[in-house]
């Protein structure tokens, strides 16, 4: 089962203890997570159900919601089960699965947000050429590329992280298996891997982020040249939701993966990880539904149809 360097399981110390205050926090977090799962699932169903939302923009938004549902499902069920049962062990395979899915979904979301920025650029700056610049074929290719690039990063991180010897070190002071936290337990020189991971994070975060900034710089210039006040308002309303989501996601991701090692602390890692795995997925459907009249219209039509069916 185990020798001096092989560890068949790990112990996740978790996010909460069993004090009264932490029990209340746990219930609040659980409520937020359930709301997040409901909101993102509803967004996916609305986009699939309402033909008015069958456009590249909303297809990409449905993929963002799918990634958020999977991201929450990767970490929270295990955390909740551990807290309620007191069993904190996670197998090596289970830990590897979490390490794989988190970069897959997080990295995929980086590229997906860049694809969504390009979609808004094409719609605002070149509305007449939009069907050509953002064809369904291109949209599907970009979406597939986002998933594949994220999966490649996740696979590399999972294989490399679990290849290190851990010399019987079991306890992970976190609520899920995350590469930067787990690598600290390794009883081998991980500097080459950490440097490679840092470079990879720079590429996966800053390259898409630069594309997003460039897209919105061009969008802003185009909006300022619009003569119609109504057109300006519509363009700002369409893009402001995406800008808010980008700010939340990239802020948390850059803080987590691009801080110098000397500035890292376990408590900060837990808080930031909780933010981008639990709270950001909740905010995405709220931001897009509140700011978007088409989504609100689809929700109203869906509720009306449900009421009509219930009366039959």
Swiss-Prot record:
Keyword Membrane listed? The answer is: yes
Provide the alphabetized UniProt keywords: Cell membrane, Disulfide bond, G-protein coupled receptor, Glycoprotein, Membrane, Olfaction, Receptor, Sensory transduction, Transducer, Transmembrane, Transmembrane helix
Fetch the Pfam families from UniProt: 7tm_4
Q: Which residues lie on this side of the membrane: Extracellular?
A: 1-26, 77-96, 165-201, 256-269
Taxonomic superkingdom: Eukaryota
Q: What the protein does?
A: Odorant receptor.
Family per similarity comment: Belongs to the G-protein coupled receptor 1 family.
What this protein is called in its record is Olfactory receptor 2T8
Source species of the chain: Homo sapiens (Human)
Q: Which gene encodes it?
A: OR2T8
């Amino acid at each position: 089962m185990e020798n001096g360097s092989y560890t068949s399981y790990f112990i996740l110390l978790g996010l909460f203890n069993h004090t009264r205050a932490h029990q209340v926090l746990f219930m609040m977090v659980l409520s937020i997570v359930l709301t997040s799962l409901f909101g993102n699932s509803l967004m996916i169903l609305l986009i699939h159900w309402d033909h008015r939302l069958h456009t590249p923009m909303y297809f990409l938004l449905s993929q963002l919601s799918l990634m958020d549902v999977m991201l929450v499902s990767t970490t929270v069920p295990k955390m909740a089960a551990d807290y309620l049962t007191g069993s904190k062990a996670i197998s090596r395979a289970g830990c590897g699965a979490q390490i794989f899915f988190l970069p897959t979904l997080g990295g995929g979301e980086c590229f997906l947000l860049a694809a969504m920025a390009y979609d808004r650029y094409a719609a605002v700056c070149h509305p007449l050429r939009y069907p050509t610049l953002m064809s369904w074929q291109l949209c599907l290719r970009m979406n597939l590329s986002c998933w594949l690039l994220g999966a490649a990063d996740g696979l590399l991180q999972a294989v490399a992280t679990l290849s290190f010897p851990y010399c019987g070190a079991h306890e992970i002071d976190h609520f899920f298996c995350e590469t930067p936290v787990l690598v600290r337990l390794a009883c081998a020189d991980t500097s080459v891997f950490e440097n490679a991971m840092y470079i990879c994070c720079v590429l996966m975060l800053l390259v898409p982020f630069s594309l997003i900034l460039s897209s919105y710089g061009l969008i802003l210039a185009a909006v300022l040249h619009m003569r119609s006040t109504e057109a300006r308002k519509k363009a700002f309303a369409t893009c402001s939701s995406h800008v808010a989501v980008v700010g939340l996601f990239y802020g948390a991701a850059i803080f987590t993966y691009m801080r110098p090692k000397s500035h890292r602390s376990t408590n900060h890692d837990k808080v930031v990880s909780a933010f981008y795995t639990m709270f950001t997925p909740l905010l995405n459907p709220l931001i897009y539904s509140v700011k978007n009249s088409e989504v609100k219209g689809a929700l109203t039509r869906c509720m009306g149809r449900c009421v009509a069916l219930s009366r039959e």
